[in-house]
Every structure is written in structure tokens, then in C-alpha cells.
């Protein structure tokens, strides 16, 4: 797969609004493929929780993929680390750019950066959309659960690597 070129930089506070819009767009445009309308609304609503979304982005090592030339945001990926273990907290691609390898490349760069800082293993809770990306990156499915989010139940998958 020929992954679109992108610039890669760390997220800063000024990015939160743009990333929330990308997150909301992904939920609203992709969510109906696998979720009920109520689940889609619940998923998208997190983008409106400014303090929560700000912590989601800035409380982890989040990086942004931008299109070269105009710096249009293409996606973002964040990981937190503790005691040598990394938890991938976010992996979102703008809907017009899904299925082009961008998510896999952002995940690869995120894991590589964390490994260079001493992280030896990774885990994540993922959705039906990102599960194939994580499996392709060498993660194994270890658990499937029904868990509440914004008042709705969602099926989520636990994946681990290393």
C-alpha cells in the first residue's frame, strides 16, 4: 500500500479544537457502519466535552499527521507509558483518508517512538474500525467486552503486543 505522505508533529493545546472536530467527524461518518444511531451520538459527544477531550489529547504523547504543503490535519495517535508499558489511547484518521494505510503508519511511528524511549510492551482498547490496524501491527486480541461509554454499551476489544 502506498501511504500518503504526511508531516508528523506533537500535539499542542491549540490543536485540541481541530482534533475534536476530526474525532466527531469520524464518529458521525464511520459510526453508522457498525453502531446504532444512539451509539453514534454517544461516541461523537465526547468531542463536545472540552476538558475531557483536552486531557485525552494533551494527557498523552499525542502526535498529529498533517498533509504537506497546507498542514491539513489527516489524523492523530496518542500513547501513554508507565513502567515500560504503553497504552495506545487514540488512533483517528479523517474519514476521507481511511483505508489508505495512514492509520497503520501513524501507529507504527507512535510505537517506534515509544520503544526508543524504553517502552517494551503495548496494549489498547480498540473499536471495530481500528482492530484490523492493530492486528496488522502485531497486536493480539486478548479480550472482548461490552462496556459503557457516554451512557451507551459498546463492544470493545483489548489488544496487546510485546
Predicted feature descriptions by range:
Residues 121-125, 140-158:
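Conserved catalytic-core motifs of GNAT/GCN5-like acyltransferases
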Residues 1-17, 162:
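Conserved N-terminal entry element of GNAT/NAT acetyltransferase domains
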Residues 93, 126, 159-161:
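Hydrophobic residues in beta-strands and at strand termini
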Residues 66-68, 159-162:
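Active-site beta-strand termini and strand-to-loop segments that position acidic
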Residues 10-13, 21-96, 107-109, 113, ...:
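Acetyl-CoA-dependent GNAT
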Residues 101:
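Conserved G/P- and acidic residue-centered "switch" motifs that form tight phosphate/ATP-binding loops
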Residues 134-135, 139:
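Conserved active-site tyrosine of GNAT-family acetyltransferases
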